[in-house]
Each structure stands twice: as structure tokens, then as C-alpha cells.
Design a protein with these regions (language model features):
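Short, surface-exposed beta-edge/turn micro-motifs
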Residues: 62-63, 177-180
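Active-site-proximal betaalpha loop/short-helix elements
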Residues: 2-5, 79, 98-174
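Short hydrophobic/aromatic beta-strand micro-patches
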Residues: 46, 181-185
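Glycine-rich anion-binding loops of enzyme active sites
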Residues: 1-81, 194
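Active-site glycine-rich loop that binds ribose-phosphate moieties when present
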Residues: 44-54, 90-110, 163
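A structural signal for short secondary-structure junctions
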Residues: 163, 172-176, 185, 196-197
Length: 218
């Protein structure tokens, strides 16, 4: 911390960490404080898993699924960055998703039960979908026509027009979405593509996008 933060701000951070831990039935077991020019919060989580679902299991013929539509956090960032007034519930939701991301842990747990491979997409579908494809030795074909069928697509597209950023950039390259990407057969989630022979990620009926956040380049 910088030493300039007021006590209530610090307490709000502590309350937020405690609440998120409570949702997962986890315990906060320690920590330390140091002074720096900017506030940095670093958290390490430990746990046990009987049968991990990794990025390595995707097979040709699998389908590709999302736990929920991505792009809302990037939409919220652009609304804030451009200083726009929030004119709809959808815009309020987008800003909330950027400022305080929500994670559907139940969806993640259910996905992992039947998925052949799985990852989060907080750096973007383009980057982490590509990483999953590389780990599994396959190609992910992401289909824009499938994504358009999501019931929230039209609302997100309206925001994209207002902020002047292509909706596909928000969905595929935006990042900061706390959603899950998985491969498998007949998963009860939103299908966005298929697994085919090849490598990397291919966008079908989706214009070129900037890939998103790369920790080793940005």
C-alpha cells in the first residue's frame, strides 16, 4: 500500500476477500503488508483436487463451450474510459462486471465434471483458447454464428456501438472476463465452436481482433 489509503478502503478490501473466501468455503490464513508507490494485492490459493481437468485433453470432434458470454468487462471498461453516462441496466451491469467481476463457481464445477479440457479466459478467448489448443495439439474453430445466438449478444452489441469498439473485439479479445472455456460432448453450456485437426485458434465469421493481454509482451 502507499500509506495514503483511508482505513475504510483497506477494510473494504479485507471484507471483499473474506466474502469471496466464504463463498468457496475457504479460509484466509495469513498475509503481510508492505509500502510501495502503488497498491498491489497478491493472493495465493492452495487446495486439493482428485482429478484435475487441464488444458491437455481436447480431442478432434469435441465441441467448444463457454460458461457465459464474454465481453461485458471490456464493455464496462470502455464505458468508464470514455466517461459515458450509463443509460441502461445492461450498461450498469457491464461496469459492475469490470469493477467487481463475478465468478459462477457452480458453472465451473459442473463444467469440469464432463469436460475433456478446460481453462479460464481472463486474458481473452483468443489467447487462452489458443493456449488450450496448443496444449491439446488441436485447433479450436470459434463460430461467430453460434455466438450470435446467445440471448445477451444484442445487448452487448448495442454497448459496443456506443463505445465505438467492435463487439467481436469485446467478446474474443477483451479479456478480464471471469468465465470458463471447455471442450467436450453435449455439455450443458453455451456452444461456440468445435475442435478440429490442426493447431491454434480459427475465427469463423468473426473479423480479425486484437488478441488481448499477454503477460510476457504487454
Amino acid at each position: 500500500a502507499t500509506g495514503k489509503e483511508d482505513l475504510e478502503f483497506i477494510l473494504d478490501i479485507a471484507r471483499g476477500i473474506a466474502e469471496e473466501a466464504r463463498i468457496l468455503d475457504a479460509q484466509v490464513i495469513g498475509g503481510d503488508l508492505s509500502r510501495a508507490d502503488q497498491l498491489v494485492i497478491s493472493i495465493t490459493a492452495f487446495g486439493e483436487v482428485d482429478k484435475p481437468t487441464t488444458r491437455r485433453g481436447a480431442k478432434v470432434g469435441d465441441d467448444v463451450y463457454l460458461s457465459n458470454l464474454t465481453g461485458w468487462s471490456a464493455a464496462g471498461f470502455n464505458l468508464l474510459n470514455k466517461g459515458l453516462n450509463l443509460n441502461s441496466e445492461e450498461e450498469i451491469f457491464a461496469v459492475a462486471e469490470h469493477r467487481s467481476p463475478s465468478v459462477d463457481y457452480d458453472n465451473g464445477i459442473e463444467m469440469a465434471k464432463k469436460a475433456t479440457s478446460m481453462c479460464d479466459v481472463s486474458d481473452s478467448i483468443f489467447i487462452q483458447g489458443g493456449q488450450l489448443a496448443e496444449s491439446s495439439g488441436v485447433k479450436l474453430e470459434i463460430d461467430g454464428e453460434l455466438i450470435r445466438t446467445h440471448p445477451d449478444f444484442a445487448d452487448l452489441e448495442k454497448i459496443s456501438v456506443r463505445v465505438g469498439v467492435d463487439v467481436w473485439q469485446l467478446i474474443i479479445g477483451g479479456g478480464e472476463d471471469h468465465a470458463f472455456l471447455a471442450t467436450g460432448i453435449d455439455l450443458p453450456f453455451f456452444k461456440i465452436g468445435t475442435v478440429v485437426a490442426g493447431n491454434g485458434i480459427e475465427l469463423k465469421k468473426i473479423p480479425a481482433v486484437q488478441p488481448g493481454w499477454d503477460h510476457f509482451k504487454n
